[in-house]
Swiss-Prot record:
A GO CC annotation given for this chain: cytosol
Region annotation Disordered: where it falls in the sequence: 17-85, 143-176, 609-646
Protein name per Swiss-Prot or TrEMBL: Serine/threonine-protein kinase sck2
Active-site positions on this chain: D392
Basic and acidic residues composition-biased segments: 622-637
GO molecular-function terms, A-Z: ATP binding; protein serine kinase activity; protein serine/threonine kinase activity
Species the sequence originates in: Schizosaccharomyces pombe (strain 972 / ATCC 24843)
Stated family: Belongs to the protein kinase superfamily. AGC Ser/Thr protein kinase family. PKC subfamily.
Keyword tags: ATP-binding, Kinase, Nucleotide-binding, Phosphoprotein, Serine/threonine-protein kinase, Transferase
GO biological process per UniProt: intracellular signal transduction; negative regulation of conjugation with cellular fusion; negative regulation of G2/M transition of mitotic cell cycle; TORC1 signaling
Function field: Protein kinase that is part of growth control pathway which is at least partially redundant with the cAMP pathway.
Domain AGC-kinase C-terminal: 528-605
Biased composition (Polar residues): 68-80
Compositionally skewed regions (Low complexity) per UniProt: 149-165, 610-621
Length: 646
């Protein structure tokens, strides 16, 4: 079966599956290779699934249950203090990873023996939601060690040229002992839109990627300032024999070298997905060499399928979620367009899709499922606070980063601007995860549909199959509206079963979360022992770490795509590509699509490119104006775009 990770990145496979069609994916079957479901949307005629033979809705249906055990999730600590800056930073931060220094009261011979056992260490650098995986650490020749000087604020002249014009000096090396120290000559450049600390995690590849230790650095965001750090590493209990472990790093921050981006600013590395509207590539940004995921969509296909409103709406929601700054939502970094195509550039999550890992494991231990559900709650919290209902929660839309934290993606079925007390009626979602109120369409629905899907997801992760499994879609709908949910004997804890029961309450007014949204769900005993502040700061170690060999590792993607030769110009390929160009009226439907993840870039640097609307940057002020203009254009061009979700 095709790996849905590759097809579902950005939701390429989800669009407009008619609800009254005989075709479509069957729901997941119990204890078998998990089948993936296509989301469904309202058809052109607004047709809903045939449920007239289902009878009245079943409210608060009792669920059968059995017992199991429960345990807790571990955590780690850190201190976050950022230096003050005299401006809103927008530019490039270059980080050079120096060497590890292992000190302490041991003899040189003992330390040398200790180091020889740790010859496959590597570093995962977390910069906001962007991550970098270093090459394996190399051992420096014996008798050499770096100095342990602390932060050095040596000035580097300010310049708007490329990063190479101000290379980071090599750390001073001096002979201090006969201890070999690991050395990595790697460096990374991050695109900066806001001041954040740098989270550095060290892992031992030679010991099944065991976590070794963690440290933070808090770089200055003053332009041209070079800094040198030699930070103490907080080691894990398994490596507490490593006394006084330190990591040397250097940073320098520089202003932007350009203020607009297009396809020519990125180099394609691999094709990682393909769908109805276009392709998804693993790309490298030329100026910073950062790796991202780029979705390329054909405008003509979008217009032909009347999906302009949904496509631009997805971009709008990605802008809002990027502003939310949630570490558990895939961040939009750039969006731009050409006369033919739309481009969405987000962080690349090399850990793979949760669906892919669930398919391999069949089910997860309860503690692992608890960790994912807890982080998903924080993602939903960020969405709901901004009036966004997600509507398509499922394993295919949950990505893992290199360290094993989740990141929610694909907002094509989400709806924004849903205030408290209001409802919507569009029939959309994925069959296995549809809430009863969506199927019955009696009085519309609200954000409670996300909690129903969360309950289905928790059941599926812990039991290995869908709670409402059926051989056909109509029977699946009946099971969702009426069916009993049965729990395998002895598999789940009392708390897990109770949480699933409360989330799968068929009356949305009595569903857990109805009276306090995410915060109400977080208080359930299932989550006792979780420090939510540490979880939000990613200070709790994930129970599972994906195998990732480097920042461009695509081993978690379908080889059907990654083994294909790629077109270097990113242009979408479809049967309409050689037809007449789109009219200016239709092109106006895509107005305001361009975005760069730096709300203050226009104001900070005075960049306004009025001659090139396809490459202009949308600041927060401009974004609001663009949104207003775009709404008018959408209303004028509904013949091309289809109806906007009410």
């Amino acid at each position: 079966m095709m790996n849905k990770w590759a097809k579902n990145w950005f939701g390429l496979s989800k669009k407009s599956v008619s609800t009254n069609s005989a075709k479509g994916s069957l729901p997941r079957s119990p204890l078998a290779s998990i089948q993936t479901n296509q989301p469904v949307e309202e058809g052109e005629g607004g047709s809903l699934p045939s449920v007239s033979n289902l009878g009245p809705s079943s409210i608060d249906h009792p669920m059968e249950e059995f017992a199991s055990d429960q345990s807790t999730v571990g955590n780690r600590n850190s201190n976050d203090i950022l230096p003050e800056v005299d401006h809103e930073p927008s530019g490039y931060l270059k980080l050079q990873i120096g060497s590890l220094v292992l000190g302490g009261p041991h003899t040189d011979a003992a330390l040398a023996m200790e180091c020889s056992r740790l010859n496959q260490l590597f570093v995962v650098v977390q910069f906001g939601t962007t991550e970098f995986v270093s090459p394996p650490l190399k051992w420096e020749s014996p008798g050499r060690d770096i100095g342990t000087s602390s932060r050095d604020s040596a000035n580097v002249s300010r310049s708007s040229s490329m990063m190479s014009s101000h290379p980071i000096p090599t750390p001073a090396i001096q002979r201090t002992s006969s201890i070999p120290n690991p050395l990595t000559p790697s460096y990374v450049v991050f695109d900066v839109a806001k001041p954040v600390p740098i989270d550095v995690n060290i892992y031992d590849h030679g010991n099944n990627n065991e976590f070794v230790g963690r440290t933070y650095i808090h770089p200055s965001y003053n332009y041209g300032q070079f800094e040198q750090f030699c930070n103490s590493v907080e080691v894990s209990p398994a490596y507490n024999r490593m006394v006084d472990l330190r990591l040397s790093l250097n940073t320098v921050f520089q202003p932007l070298s350009q203020h607009s981006y297009g396809p020519d600013d990125f180099v394609p590395l691999k094709l990682i997905g393909k769908g109805t509207f276009g392709q998804v590539y693993l790309v490298r940004k030329k100026d910073t060499e950062r790796v991202y995921a780029m979705k390329v969509l054909s405008k003509k296909v979008i217009v032909r399928r009347k999906e302009v409103a949904h496509t631009v709406g997805e971009r709008d929601i990605l802008v809002q979620t990027s502003a939310a700054d949630s570490p558990f939502i895939v961040a939009l970094r750039f969006s731009f367009q050409t006369p033919k195509d739309l481009y969405l550039v987000t962080d690349y999550m090399a850990g793979g899709e949760l669906f892919w890992h669930l398919q391999k494991s069949v089910r997860f231990p309860e503690e692992r499922a608890k960790f994912y559900i807890a982080e998903l709650l924080l993602a939903l919290q960020a969405l709901h606070k901004r009036g966004i209902v997600y509507r398509d929660l499922k394993p295919e839309n949950i990505l893992l980063d290199v360290q094993g934290h989740i990141a929610l993606c694909d907002f094509g079925l989400s709806k924004a601007n849903l205030s408290v007390g209001t409802t919507t009626r569009t029939f959309c979602g994925t069959t296995d995860y549809l809430a009863p109120e969506v199927i019955l369409d009696e009085a519309g629905y609200d954000m409670m549909v996300d909690f129903w899907s969360l309950g289905v997801l928790l059941y599926e992760m812990t039991c290995g199959w869908s709670p409402f499994y059926a051989d056909n879609t109509q029977q699946l709908y009946k099971n969702i509206v009426f069916g009993k949910v049965r729990f395998p004997r002895g598999l789940l804890s009392v708390e897990a079963r109770d949480l699933i029961k409360l989330l799968l309450n068929r009356n949305p007014k009595h569903r857990l979360g109805a009276h306090g949204d995410v915060e109400e769900v977080m208080k359930h005993p299932f989550f006792d022992g979780i420090d939510w502040k540490k979880l939000a700061a990613k200070e709790i170690s994930p129970p599972f770490k994906p195998i990732v060999e480097g920042e461009i590792d695509v081993s978690n993607f379908d080889v059907e795509f990654t083994n294909k030769a790629i077109d270097r110009d990113f242009s979408s390929t479809d049967e309409m590509s050689t037809s007449a160009p789109l009219s200016s009226t239709v092109q106006n439907g895509f107005k305001g699509f361009t975005y760069i993840d730096a709300s203050a870039m226009d104001e900070a640097f005075g960049y306004h490119n009025s001659n090139d609307s396809a490459s202009s940057i949308s600041s927060q002020d401009d974004y609001s104006k663009d949104n207003s203009d775009m709404d008018l254009n959408r209303a004028n061009d509904e013949v091309f775009m289809g109806q906007i979700d009410p």
